[in-house]
């Protein structure tokens, strides 16, 4: 070690410095020693952290004292804006934007204030030290602790214009706390969604690039890609030196001034060289890149450059594809997912503010093209249409005049001063829109509704409404011209439906005067019944009985069983009915009220029903039964049916056998009647057993009796020698004893045509509906229906049905009529209850609401008493609407259908000023606050002048000259609202509005934040090569732009005129804005409108341009354009989030997306149209064709997204393990594909050693490599006696030939053994082994050669 003095550098080593230090150590001294150094640094850090004991206490959070004044200034500005809004100078949207921008500005200013405050007062403050050394926390967190939290977005992404003014040190108010938790929740949800997305992206990336391995040293290509610094507007995002670091020069780099070669071709660019190139001012450098590498299915060392992990040339066999995929996928989590549609708020960053550097005068040159323009804060400004300059002439300072300053303004900038205006130092002159991409920030249409702040009548001033009808026939009214909408104050009353006004325009009403009244009338008339007003609730309902029916002879008794009440009705002739509808409920027309209880029609078993003379109504639901129309007889043939589902083995009787009652027919089932058994079975499963009672008559000749099957035998008829005494039913059966006839008994039930109805008395209004009870008989079964049952069934039911006659009622009541069932005590005998059915018309009285301000107070009076009989159409009650305050009635529209609102102009709505001077205003003028009414007198509030009276008229003429005149000016309060052109009007001139009614929908454009789809979704869109939603229009050929304007000043189309005079038209869709001004010259592929470009279209445009050098050159050129586009766009997204990724990683991925072409025509090759083949492969085949004279294959380059590319890879094993396994494998099997196992994934799946790293060359010929030590940079190991030197680095060890000399030969160094061969193997067999090894090698060689040939053939 030399005796030089140590140099002490007085610097703070922050995170960045530390990073550089460690990377330097790593590059020069290798991993092991760096690890030791890092350890020592760690110990140092911990030791001093322990000594210092830096921690945060609440006292460390120092709030800058200037915070108060900053907030006050902001509030002041907002108050001023509010006043402008009140005066109708700006719209609601402009006010909102201004408020938000003000708060954002304040928040930023406060942040800077926090920093300076810490620096000046206490640089050793622990909070400050932590945040600014990069140890913990960052400035935005500190801002929340000691500055202000700022604005938050609500769940819809709209910004809430109430900022959080406090910080966590001072504590949040409840409102602020809740607003603040909105944003926090959003962050959490976002993160949760992000991790999954990012993981999937990484998986797809790995899959597409896993087989990219460095396999050659130099592919020998002369192509390269130009590298420039990456800029956005005037801001450099990535410096040239950063982009060059670790690349290999593709063409000699020449110094622009001295013309000497700084770096010859194939030089790796180190850090120093990169800085030197940048210093020399070289604009762009052509470097070799994975995009242009010509190695087959891999990338060569020279095209890849340094492995960024060690800052050395990349090793052969390095799996650069996987590294690239991980480098792009890993930061994915840090990208924000959802864009906060924050109402165009964060676009404050977009514009750079130009402030005056000194006092002076501004001159705008004549040739500067500007137009007046209203800014988003509602201020007037000039909009610059083409690039130019403005001149600032400084004020004269003494004798010498400083030179005037030129200020450059770009197209799209906004100038805030006018020609010749005096400006002060620091005054805002202009906002320059950043050049380049941001001029095409997308805008989107958004709407905001404006609600009225006061009730009153609407008056349009300067607003020109315009009606549009869309295809659906909906009309919308929009403002063709902007202007003011005035709301002139007054009390607006909402009239209830059906109210009639009793006043007219201009009438004067006193307090509690009647404005309108509603009448409650009855439609049908009848007997009034007022339900008893229970103490708690007043009488709201009036019932009018229009019709009723009473069962006057029947008594009602109640039986309770199991907690349910059964009502039984006993009629005069002792029929008992069961009430089916409980009292107090409503009964519809045709509903059953009661059912007769009788057992006359009950059977004992199931059986078979036949009608004799009985007729039923055909229609009707089977559920309710069939109504009997004509009486007659029901014939019932009993039979007993057992439905069983059991195995046939459980049957104990035979089909056709005669059994006695009580026989067990099936296991556990006994029959109840004697008779013949009929068994139904299906698939050895017993379905049902039927026992048919009757007598069995054996037959000798079946033919003779077959006609008697299923017939009735009348009494007195003879059958087989027997005379029947009663009606029998004959059936033919096959019994076990032989053929027989079964004679079955028949039961008859008589059905009367008209059942008797209990006597009723009914009351009915002459106009109303009549109501009566009708008895109906219903049969539940059809003719010839079999009733399967063991127990008995009821064959006929007699029911009482309610019938309401509806005559001409349809228009009043669409609802079906209903009657109420009530029990009323009998008039003579109070103990007996009678059943009464009534039809009520029930009228509800309006409650008198004092609370609803818009309705005025109401007063309701009842016009009838209980028990009155009234005629239809009489008034039952009337409600009057009273005015709350006296005033004049206005705003009753004449001739309009029903008037729903009316306005009372109160005294409090008007103010009178007494003025001595002559007023400058006249009646009817609309004035805003601050207008001069008379010399020296200004209006305090906005409104309309109602009258100007001359009060001081003197009586005598000679005094007239002396007396001063007095004027009384009366102003009616009002409120103006500014409406921007194109807003949707929701009211008309002269309408009456309540407070809070919507007046207009303001339509405004807001900038979509950034490139709207930032972050992961945008990266995914690029890498999956999706077509963007609103893509821009690309110029297909170069030329001069001519803009075609439509009937507005809207651009509707763009014409591009080429140099040879060809004109191409590009129509602009809705929502597309010009990106190129009129007259500019554009190259092919240049976006003409705003929006993201469609990469497929870029490829198509450049490919269709064609080229003299044939289709291959053309395809390569087009692919290179789209590759550059993709690399830059992906970089943009990551840069916008402050994430640095080396270009080469993105290039490796993009290379995999762009190396295929689609065959259009196979020519004489073996390729089929539509097949996806690698570009280089087609080109080789085409070259072969050119030699043999065959027709070449025609193709189009394609861009595949990463998923598509993964599925189209050569290796089907890799593709199948990714997605759509069955499809990939079946296709591979049909095509008979072979997998050459070139990538990592295939080998992992099969279980071989992967061909990367140490496994590289395991399956390749060993002789390819030159000796490693020639590639090795010289080591910087110092010859010191430091114990650290015992540590050898894994990468520098090769330079020190530590292995036995025999093994340092070429070809073996990639398989270094740890121990010497001699130590492993005993001496005798050593020679033998040596010989064998050589043989192995040869075998290997041959095999590998084969493989190589295959390779070539495949290429």
From Swiss-Prot:
Amino acids binding Zn(2+): 219, 293, 300, 303
Enzyme class: transferase
Record-level GO cellular component terms: DNA-directed RNA polymerase complex
Co-factor note (free text): Binds 1 Zn(2+) ion per subunit.
Superkingdom classification of source: Bacteria
Any one Gene Ontology molecular-function term assigned to this protein's record: DNA binding
Region Disordered, annotated ranges: 1331-1355
SUPFAM superfamilies in the record: beta and beta-prime subunits of DNA dependent RNA-polymerase
Function: DNA-dependent RNA polymerase catalyzes the transcription of DNA into RNA using the four ribonucleoside triphosphates as substrates.
Assembly notes: In cyanobacteria the RNAP catalytic core is composed of 2 alpha, 1 beta, 1 beta', 1 gamma and 1 omega subunit. When a sigma factor is associated with the core the holoenzyme is formed, which can initiate transcription.
NCBIfam families: PRK02597.1, rpoC2_cyan
Protein name as it appears in the record: DNA-directed RNA polymerase subunit beta'
Organism (species): Nostoc sp. (strain PCC 7120 / SAG 25.82 / UTEX 2576)
